[in-house]
Each structure stands twice: as structure tokens, then as C-alpha cells.
Amino acid sequence: EITTFAALTERFNLPNGNYQRPKLLYCSNGGHFLRILPDGKVDGTRDRSDPYIQLQFYAESVGEVYIKSLETGQYLAMDSDGRLYASQSPSEECLFLERLEENHYNTYKSKMHADKDWFVGIKKNGKTKLGSRTHFGQKAILFLPLPV
């Protein structure tokens, strides 16, 4: 017996998404949480109680997100050299393509540098990885969004 369902014909006018609850981005490479510091520096820390690791995600469109520090109010950004930094206001450098991979980890690719495949990445020592040094398949680019 086959059950069929009617196609959904309603349209929903929803505002640009905000993932409601803050998240932590846990990197599988070295066990670091992505941290956005007040001085504009971005790195990783293993300290789960660090206030600078609480992040708010905002969807610009499907699969495109801004990542903002709850503590500093700054946005994660990647410059033209592939360096991660904190920006005071959202810009093109702050948009990332969020993708759920087959291994259930998320990756965040710079939209501005999508043609170069530059990802957000954290090295085992907690320092950020240059976008130009990242590529698909590296543990440094795999993140688990966790509840605060």
C-alpha cells in the first residue's frame, strides 16, 4: 500500500533566520571552541566557560550565515589574505556558507572567497588557520555547533 501526501501550497513569510539560541562552535581538531575576542583576534580555546565563545548565528539566506559574538557584538570575518578577524559590523567578509557534511560536522566557507574554497579552520594549537591553507577533508575545518 502506498500513501501519498498533498503538496504543500502555503507560503510562509519568515524573517531572516536567527538561530534563536546561542551556540558554541567546537572544532574536532584539538578540541577547541571558536573564540572572538574584543581586540579583534579570533582563535580557539578549550575553556568551555570562556564568555567569548558564545556565538549567535544569523541567516542571510539559505546556507549563508553571519556569526556574531554575544559578548563582544563583533562578527567573524575573513579578509582577502584568508585571515580570520572580528569585524564591528556585518560586511561581505562576514558571510559564510554553512554546510552540514556527511560526517555530521559543519563547515563554514567564506562566501567572498568561495571560488578559492577558503574555510574557517582552527589548528591543533588553537590558532586560526589561513583560509588559503584549508581544504576539504581537513579536521581543522570541521565544527560541531553545540548548545551553550
Swiss-Prot record:
<dbReference type="GO" id="GO:0008201">
    <property type="term" value="F:heparin binding"/>
</dbReference>
<keyword id="KW-0963">Cytoplasm</keyword>
<dbReference type="GO" id="GO:0005104">
    <property type="term" value="F:fibroblast growth factor receptor binding"/>
</dbReference>
<dbReference type="GO" id="GO:0045944">
    <property type="term" value="P:positive regulation of transcription by RNA polymerase II"/>
</dbReference>
<dbReference type="GO" id="GO:0030335">
    <property type="term" value="P:positive regulation of cell migration"/>
</dbReference>
<dbReference type="GO" id="GO:0005829">
    <property type="term" value="C:cytosol"/>
</dbReference>
<keyword id="KW-0221">Differentiation</keyword>
<dbReference type="GO" id="GO:0045766">
    <property type="term" value="P:positive regulation of angiogenesis"/>
</dbReference>
<dbReference type="GO" id="GO:0005576">
    <property type="term" value="C:extracellular region"/>
</dbReference>
<dbReference type="GO" id="GO:0045542">
    <property type="term" value="P:positive regulation of cholesterol biosynthetic process"/>
</dbReference>
<dbReference type="GO" id="GO:0008543">
    <property type="term" value="P:fibroblast growth factor receptor signaling pathway"/>
</dbReference>
<dbReference type="GO" id="GO:0044548">
    <property type="term" value="F:S100 protein binding"/>
</dbReference>
<dbReference type="GO" id="GO:0001525">
    <property type="term" value="P:angiogenesis"/>
</dbReference>
<keyword id="KW-0217">Developmental protein</keyword>
<dbReference type="GO" id="GO:0005634">
    <property type="term" value="C:nucleus"/>
</dbReference>
<dbReference type="GO" id="GO:0008083">
    <property type="term" value="F:growth factor activity"/>
</dbReference>
<comment type="similarity">
    <text>Belongs to the heparin-binding growth factors family.</text>
</comment>
<keyword id="KW-0339">Growth factor</keyword>
<keyword id="KW-0358">Heparin-binding</keyword>
<protein>
    <recommendedName>
        <fullName>Fibroblast growth factor 1</fullName>
    </recommendedName>
</protein>
<feature type="binding site">
    <location>
        <position position="29"/>
    </location>
    <ligand>
        <name>heparin</name>
    </ligand>
</feature>
<dbReference type="GO" id="GO:0005615">
    <property type="term" value="C:extracellular space"/>
</dbReference>
<keyword id="KW-0497">Mitogen</keyword>
<keyword id="KW-0964">Secreted</keyword>
<dbReference type="InterPro" id="IPR008996">
    <property type="entry name" value="IL1/FGF"/>
</dbReference>
<dbReference type="GO" id="GO:0060681">
    <property type="term" value="P:branch elongation involved in ureteric bud branching"/>
</dbReference>
<feature type="propeptide">
    <location>
        <begin position="1"/>
        <end position="11"/>
    </location>
</feature>
<dbReference type="GO" id="GO:1902533">
    <property type="term" value="P:positive regulation of intracellular signal transduction"/>
</dbReference>
<dbReference type="GO" id="GO:0005938">
    <property type="term" value="C:cell cortex"/>
</dbReference>
<comment type="function">
    <text>Plays an important role in the regulation of cell survival, cell division, angiogenesis, cell differentiation and cell migration. Functions as a potent mitogen in vitro. Acts as a ligand for FGFR1 and integrins. Binds to FGFR1 in the presence of heparin leading to FGFR1 dimerization and activation via sequential autophosphorylation on tyrosine residues which act as docking sites for interacting proteins, leading to the activation of several signaling cascades. Binds to integrins.</text>
</comment>
<dbReference type="InterPro" id="IPR002209">
    <property type="entry name" value="Fibroblast_GF_fam"/>
</dbReference>
<keyword id="KW-0539">Nucleus</keyword>
<dbReference type="GO" id="GO:0005178">
    <property type="term" value="F:integrin binding"/>
</dbReference>
<dbReference type="GO" id="GO:0008284">
    <property type="term" value="P:positive regulation of cell population proliferation"/>
</dbReference>
<dbReference type="GO" id="GO:0072163">
    <property type="term" value="P:mesonephric epithelium development"/>
</dbReference>
<dbReference type="GO" id="GO:0051781">
    <property type="term" value="P:positive regulation of cell division"/>
</dbReference>
<dbReference type="GO" id="GO:0030154">
    <property type="term" value="P:cell differentiation"/>
</dbReference>
<feature type="region of interest" description="Heparin-binding">
    <location>
        <begin position="123"/>
        <end position="139"/>
    </location>
</feature>
<keyword id="KW-0037">Angiogenesis</keyword>
<dbReference type="Pfam" id="PF00167">
    <property type="entry name" value="FGF"/>
</dbReference>
